[in-house]
């Protein structure tokens, strides 16, 4: 970092991720307050209500297919008993800025579930009088990380970095 000089701002740490990386970004921001903003693209839905079966594999994707959260496997068939969900992860990030890019035709995450999570988290942002700090962008598209999506995310992060 010595060569980067003034380009490195340790008080402006932001994270961004696509798909599982988007989920990891949310967890990171929720539990590390040094992270000032997070952007997630196609990164989450509801764990409690993601029991849609064959199309998404439900919570099995976390516990068996890509075992990022293996203990969720204990809740297969009892998803409503999962002790937390992504609206609560988003609420832990509040009032810091969060950008959620969730295409409406995502084959892995049901847009309606993402929308519910964001709306629930919005209530916490409202308590902080920071309702504009959580943004849901929902293009009529599929789960992918196109150059256009990358530009949307990067422009949002740049806007957060230069705001004050």
Range-by-range predicted roles:
Residues 1-19, 35:
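Gly/Ser-rich "nucleophile elbow"/oxyanion-hole loop immediately N-terminal to the catalytic nucleophile
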Residues 118-164:
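C-terminal catalytic histidine-bearing segment of alpha/beta-hydrolase fold enzymes
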Residues 40-89, 110, 114-118, 126-131:
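Mobile cap/lid helix-loop segments that gate and shape the active-site cleft of serine hydrolases
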Residues 17-27:
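Glycine-rich nucleophile elbow surrounding the catalytic serine of serine-hydrolase chemistry
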Residues 94-112:
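Conserved strand-to-loop "acid loop" that flanks and positions the catalytic carboxylate
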Residues 30-36:
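Conserved hydrolase catalytic core segment
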Residues 13, 98, 133-134:
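Short, conserved active-site loop motifs that form the nucleotide-linked donor/cofactor pocket
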Residues 16, 41-42, 101, 139:
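Alpha/beta-hydrolase-fold catalytic nucleophile elbow
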């Amino acid at each position: 970092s010595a060569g980067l000089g003034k380009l490195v701002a340790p008080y402006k740490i932001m994270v961004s991720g696509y798909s599982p990386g988007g989920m990891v970004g949310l967890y990171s921001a929720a539990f590390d307050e040094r992270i000032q903003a997070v952007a997630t693209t196609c990164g989450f839905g509801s764990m409690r209500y993601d029991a849609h079966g064959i199309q998404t594999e439900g919570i099995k994707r976390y516990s068996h297919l890509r075992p990022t959260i293996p203990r969720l496997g204990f809740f297969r068939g009892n998803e409503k008993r999962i002790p937390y969900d992504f609206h609560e992860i988003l609420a832990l990030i509040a009032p810091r800025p969060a950008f959620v890019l969730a295409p409406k035709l995502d084959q892995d995450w049901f847009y309606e579930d993402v929308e519910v999570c964001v709306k629930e988290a919005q209530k916490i942002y409202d308590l902080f009088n920071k309702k504009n700090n959580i943004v849901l962008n929902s293009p009529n598209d599929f789960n992918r990380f196109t150059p256009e999506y990358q530009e949307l995310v990067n422009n949002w992060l740049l806007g957060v970095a230069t705001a004050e």
